[in-house]
């Protein structure tokens, strides 16, 4: 029937989630969902940080799972071969692929469009910021700042370690008169958090038009008028300088961007870089220092690092 879809499930490790998501985005995938047991474990250990807990989530296996959704067409088998080969090759890049098993199932459209939402509940990710899906209710505490988010199927929910570390760093370094640039804005979560934490002006950029659309929609949900979202890369579409540039991407992209990013940061400003697997942390630090950045602090959570550096 015309509402049937093919679901490709990749059983992997938390470390490989972003890499495998990237593999799927290189194909004709229509949606991606991620089930990370580390997110569920984080929530179980921090019961005061969130509003609701579904006990059935404790039954989720230790294995992380990435699911991609496809319409069955002539290219599907080609996509599947590419996925299997790419997942198998992750070890060559020093990424633990875990089980690395790839399975295919038939699913109904309604199942994959909505089932992922049961894993996404209001979560406190910093001293002030609570990420709340737009379909959930939440009783706000006096000191809390609520970020309304509908990530859709294509973007993270804001509970990943890398996002949490970025938000905590933004909370520490943002002042009311500051300008923030967000590289690879995705759902817009960091741009929105920056604005709600008091940034005067925020510019988010992303190469993906789907991300640009998602960011703009989420900004509307939060009733903000001081965020500008642009399609393209920072060097080509943004003018001027920021007090803070934040990039939650991957180590290789951060290393590539470092020299160019320097020209977009005000003297005394900060570069908050995350999405860095711990095994690549020293490579990023070395590049930052070679480029003239001073390392302000290094945050670590799980297998990930967030490096805050400064231009004097």
UniProtKB/Swiss-Prot annotation:
A biological process (GO) of this protein is:
methylation
Gene3D superfamilies to which the protein is assigned, alphabetical: Vaccinia Virus protein VP39
- Return the EC number: 2.1.1.-
Superkingdom per UniProt: Bacteria
Residues that hold S-adenosyl-L-methionine according to the record: 163, 184, 206, 248
Q: Which reaction does it catalyse?
A: L-lysyl-[protein] + 3 S-adenosyl-L-methionine = N(6),N(6),N(6)-trimethyl-L-lysyl-[protein] + 3 S-adenosyl-L-homocysteine + 3 H(+)
The terms describing its cellular component in GO are: cytoplasm
The terms under GO molecular function for this entry are:
protein-lysine N-methyltransferase activity
By its UniProt entry, which InterPro entries does this protein fall under? Ribosomal_L11_MeTrfase_PrmA, Ribosomal_PrmA_MeTrfase, SAM-dependent_MTases_sf
Describe the task this protein carries out: Methylates ribosomal protein L11.
UniProt similarity note = Belongs to the methyltransferase superfamily. PrmA family.
- Protein name per Swiss-Prot or TrEMBL: Ribosomal protein L11 methyltransferase
Q: Which organism is it from?
A: Clostridium botulinum (strain Langeland / NCTC 10281 / Type F)
